[in-house]
Amino acid sequence: MNTYNYLIDELHILDDEIISYGKDKFKIELSLQERLKDKAPGKLILVTSINPTSSGEGKTTLSIGLAQGFKKNGKDVMLALREPSMGPVFGMKGGATGGGVSILEPSLDIDLHFNGDIHALTSANNLLSAIIDNHMYFGNELNIKDVYWQRALDVNDRSLREVKTKARDDKFTITAASEMMAILALARDFKDLKERLNNILIGTDKDGKDLFVSDLKCADSLALLLKDAIKPNLVFAKEMVPALVHAGPFANIAHGCNSVIATNTALKLADYVITEAGFGADLGMEKFLHIKQPHLYTKASVVVVVATIKALKLHGGVTESNLDEPNIEALSKGLENIEKHLENIKLFGLNSVVALNKFDTDSEEELQFLKNWARINHLNYGISEGYSKGGEGTKDLAKLVEKVAYEPSKFKRIYSNEENHEYKIRKIAENIYGAKDVIFSQQAKKKLNQYKHLEIPICIAKTPLSLSGDPKLKGRPRDFVLEISDIKVSLGANLLVVLTKGINTMPGLNNRPRALDFKLDDKGELI
């Protein structure tokens, strides 16, 4: 019996519930959820962050490190994480499998093609586009006039934001921000997946009537392409921590959470499940709590807020090129950003732990300053050194998170789905972001009226780099106005997607993309 078979046996996964993709990557059959339906779920730990630097806060690294700390303390723990998109891997941010000792393996495989889920999603997405265009070409029996559905690709390519063909104008979105990705992430089972695919709003006819995938009668073909992609992927982090890595919607331009199926499966397999929501608490956490959590077996027991001294200094006015230099004044000023995120967690009635992701460049003076700040403000505060030490560097943080997870809390939503859409948008903008007002374009107002009958959650697409809609406004912006440029409805995902000014769902590469830095030897190995 090899190491992985032994680890899978330890998880009490049966032989007919596991599918091998090589020696170190696996998928889990959906039948496992049915077998364990009567088992009580574990504790759910949600990891979020402050508004990050352009390179991120190390949320995935800390999540993995925290799980390693739980295991080091003898606890039964599992990770439930998003799978990476190739766009950022070759763009600015890089991979999304952690780093240092706190990393998923095989990291490069996971960062690229993994088990083929994103390829399957892209294929299903573009098959639907082809079916729509083909229907219009051969007679257009449905009288399709306006097509809402967009093509998708898992590459950052700004040239595809607007595409003109002989038949019609079209657009591409990155697969991670597509409705197809959101559907996979939110589906509870295969039956639910098919229902959601049928509910996709593809456009309207010449009389303005809504048209759906069900009208084209092609949902089963789309589901066929996704029949394996819906099964959660199992891999292991260093120190043999199990991780279900499945679905990867971005948090700035989508809802930013891994799949419901993976998280629910983890909750049945482990006593403690650590999951993350993309970017800061203003984006991923809010969407997790309003959009994903209602489909889970349990609610989050505690929220871990990841911060770095670098990001706090950035919010205190330091430029990114000078973040390695000690600066207590900027650090002190930047604390207003994390303080707002902690206030937001309280708005939801949840308890929090501040987790500092420690870097070698952090000075002792800065570390002591933060420790004193946390003590004075009676905060749960710990340090993660998972990157360099793995579980040994996070075991104290893990003990703190475990303790807080058992403290009483009473979750409450910021809005209910039944409320007016404009009211829901304002509640998020004013309460979570701190906006003084929200203004809507004429196009957005038209869409609000068009979809006023829908009782669905809100998914706001905005910059992750600021609490506001302007990435240049650092710290805790006040007296700003959030501008809404457009609104889209994703009825398969059951979301009202709200686009703030300047947001694109197809990113572009930066001026020096990471794609220029990869080097391989003659055997195809990374140098």
Curated annotation (Swiss-Prot):
Residues the entry annotates as binding ATP: 53-60
One GO-annotated biological process of the protein: tetrahydrofolate interconversion
Catalytic activity of the protein: (6S)-5,6,7,8-tetrahydrofolate + formate + ATP = (6R)-10-formyltetrahydrofolate + ADP + phosphate
Broad EC category: ligase
Pfam families: FTHFS (PF01268)
Family: Belongs to the formate--tetrahydrofolate ligase family.
Keyword Ligase tagged: yes
Gene Ontology MF term list: ATP binding; formate-tetrahydrofolate ligase activity
Keywords: ATP-binding, Ligase, Nucleotide-binding, One-carbon metabolism
Listed InterPro entries: Formate_THF_ligase, P-loop_NTPase
EC number: 6.3.4.3
Stated name of the protein: Formate--tetrahydrofolate ligase
Source organism of the structure: Acholeplasma laidlawii (strain PG-8A)
Gene3D superfamilies cross-referenced by the UniProt entry: Domain 2, N(10)-formyltetrahydrofolate synthetase, Formyltetrahydrofolate synthetase, domain 3, P-loop containing nucleotide triphosphate hydrolases
Known pathway: One-carbon metabolism; tetrahydrofolate interconversion
